[in-house]
Amino acid sequence: MPLSFEGTFKAKRNVNLGGKRVSNDRAQLLRKAAMERKNREEERKAENNSVAVQSLSRGFLARRKFKQDFRERWIYKYTKSGRTSIRFNTLEDIKCSISLLVLFAEPDIDLPFVSQVAHNILVWLENLIPLSNGMDDTPKSHLKVKILKVQETLSNSNDSWLWQRFSSLLLNCLVSSINSHRIEGTDTSAETSLLHCLAYVAPYLKSSELSTYYDSVMTFYAQIYPKQNMTNLEDIMSLSLLTPVSSKTDENANSSSAFLFHVLASDCFSSIENCIPPDLIIDKVFSSSLQLSEEACISSLLNLGMIKVFSLAGNCLHLLHTEYKNSSLWKFCSYILDALYVFSGESVNSRIQVVSDVDDDEDDENAFSQNYYSHLQMVAKHFSKNYANQSGIVQRSFAECISSTFITKAFKLVSSNTLQAMSHFYATMIKLFPSNRTSILMYISLVETNEGSLTRSFSRFSWDMFSESPVYQLFHKKFDVQNVLKNDSGYWFQLQLLIDVYSRMLFTMIDDEFHNDKQNPLYPVMAEFCTVLKNLVLGLYWDVQAAKDVDCKSVVDISQLRVSSTSLLQQLYRINSRKQFLPEDFFLMSEYFNLNEFEANALQESELASHAEAEINITYKFDNFSESRPRLNILNNCSFFLPFHFRIHLLQQLLLLDKQANGYAQPFGHLKHAVIRRNRIFDDGFDAFYNFGKLLKGPIRITFVDEHGVVEEGIDGGGLTKEFLTSICKTVFDINYGLFSETKAHLLYPNTHAYAQDVERLRCYEFLGMLIGKCIYEGIQIDAAFASFFVAKWLGHPSYFDDLTSLDPNLYEGLVFLKNYDGDVENDMALNFTVVHEEFGVRNVIDLIPNGSNISVTNENRLQYIHLVSNYYLNARLSRQCRAFTNGFTQIIDPHWLAMFHESEIQILVGGDPVPIDIDDLRRHTVYAGGYEPNSPTIVLFWEVLREFEEEDKRSFVKFVTSVARPPILGFKALMPSFCIRVNGEDETRLPTASTCVNLLKLPMYSTKQTLRDKLLTAVRSGVGFGFS
């Protein structure tokens, strides 16, 4: 590239004629412009504020001058030497005076003028009201005349705006006087005139001023009462309290609400209630105030705060003692109780699970599921703590409402108008006072209602009213929670109390009385009543989310309704099981379910529940309700909605899932081996397996040692395990062994002797529970029948008086005689609250209640005595043994699985189905070995002979080959291993033998039918199987 050289070596200078450029001058300019805009905006605001202040100042000064001018004019016209010099002769005189007065009067400055005007208006008003000379010359009638006359006079003036301004002025002056403590002086004439005059014009107050008005009235009374005789002020207090609510203005409902929440909620109302006719409060206040919605009314109560609501409760409940025929008062009192329940529940976690040990079913029906009952207990405890701090007036008002005298008086005159509100009231009351639940329900159940010429028990009256209601038709199918429960709450409280009362009646009603329509008022309509209950219960358990949504938005306690209705339905199902009074399959509701889908979803819910409980890793009493498990809810609480065989199949699937989850599905996996001496079978079994706990679910392997100490040959493929379980149960269920006793019907229950309650024996009962659970877990049936009251303990169900008939029929008949005795129980029978327990010749007297030996049984307390005696024999004596047995049983069988069945169904689970033996079913599920085939001559003869057996001989044969006289629940297809017939030689002189451990019949090859019959009958009637030939 060519280079050029021009004689210079410096770069050319760059000259910028625009001046030096700064790189950030743009950003700086933007900031400067923003600052200038801000300064200009602030200047504009300052100028506007200055103008506004100047305007306000000029306005204030102008108004002050304006008021002062009017004040001077009014003083010049109406005063002389500082006193009013005019008497009002006409309404126009009054209007002329106050039209000026309201323009300038200020409470702090013009109080003397306002009080003087008020005094003179009162003088004029008193002249309007004539002296009473009629027949009804009472303070109450005189008060009504005053109010009506003044309202009529003022309303005709067509100047409501003026009276509104004047009433506001009077109120402001009264408030100012109270706040400045002027009333504490000796002279209160000015304030009394203000209040008296204000009482007449109070209907013109704005709704926003009513609360202040009533607060001022009560404060005035509270401050003046200790210093003056109230007799002179009774008329003024009556007028001031009742005039607003007695007016015919549009503000009447607001006045009534203000009266309720600011007068009746005052703790000093009880001292002035004599000034106010109760019927005026009832007619004017409650009927108008309840135009408010349920939610608005309760919301207003909650805004008052708990202390005020307690005061309100005391005053309203006191009114209720005399005005118990008024439905509006009952309804409002119900709302008050709802508010107190909400206050008490705010600090309680409604889903805390509390472990409680309820052994003695000593009180009521145990109607509540564990979680909900615990929640109620905590709410009631919180309420009781606050209740204890209330005044004696409040406590006496509550005590009166739950007394026998008041309940009898009120419910005797219950009507269709008051029924729902009274039901609401007492349904909430028994939640706040759970210790009085039993007595309240008993008092109500004993009442005979009188409506017109018809006398009925409360339960029948309530049912008749409900069956005539528009919602009754909704219960003829599955209950639609979402669309029904959110409205018409009165019907649900009515149904709630009916359920509670009838449950209490059943608790003291024996079966014979239940089936007598003279002693059981609902017996003629029992089918309809049970239809309502089952459809209600199904809806509440199935539509869980809908019920939860309604529970959040409604005053109806859905949980209480669900628990109570479920408990009653379960009671009625048990009664029907003992003696049927409903059609066959009445309780089945399977038409509402696709059983295949139900089973699949129930298995999924159970698996999720098992995982959740495993993660929690705590021990607690199982809860039979969960919002996330609707199908398990139904299975655990009302399993009778579904067919029994469906539930059996579902149980088998649950057991299979549990085995798979724990690795027990393989028969030879994780074997636990034990050597068992036949003559020490229980002791060796206890030593080998007691400490296994839940691990006993897994496969076990048994080696037997005979009575000579020789180890028996054989590999345990399940048969020896079955023989071990059936043999050990046969041993301990023998009453001579000492662990069990039997009823006259040969039904087993734990021994009640003292030695049965020592620690070692209780461990034996726990082990037996584990063994029975193991039998069910493995599908092994045992030949044992248990008393229903004992099986009920496995389910956590209480035992009832009628269960005594199976334990001790003589005792049962004696208590029934006592219950129905018409004479003088105390003198004729000379009983006291004790029982005599004799053991090994030693008699012990046991008190049923403290100092029971000194308390006589009377006509009044005999039901308590009957209940306590039943509880002692069915519960107290058995509690420790049953608890130990159940603890062992539930280690193997999940309580949720167990809850799917009724007592009688669990007996079938343990010992098989008490149905006739189906020989054809047995033949279809038989296998052959050793040379026999289905068409072998001996086999053909065998089935002919077996089919001709009597039913008793058929059962003996089944017991001969399986160890149990009843077939499996799902038929012989469920027999494991399958029934097998094997050749046992050709010697026809030998008898058939059996190996019950593997359901095996060893049958010689008999050639004639008669020989086969004789030999088979001899074998099965002998009761001996293995080795007998």
UniProtKB/Swiss-Prot annotation:
Disulfide bonds: none
UniProt enzyme class: transferase
Keywords annotated in UniProt: Cytoplasm, Nucleus, Transferase, Ubl conjugation pathway
Listed GO biological process terms: ERAD pathway; protein polyubiquitination; ubiquitin-dependent protein catabolic process
This enzyme's EC code(s): 2.3.2.26
Reaction catalysis annotation: S-ubiquitinyl-[E2 ubiquitin-conjugating enzyme]-L-cysteine + [acceptor protein]-L-lysine = [E2 ubiquitin-conjugating enzyme]-L-cysteine + N(6)-ubiquitinyl-[acceptor protein]-L-lysine
Coiled-coil regions, chain positions: none
UniProt-recorded name of the protein: Probable E3 ubiquitin protein ligase C167.07c
Organism: Schizosaccharomyces pombe (strain 972 / ATCC 24843) (Fission yeast)
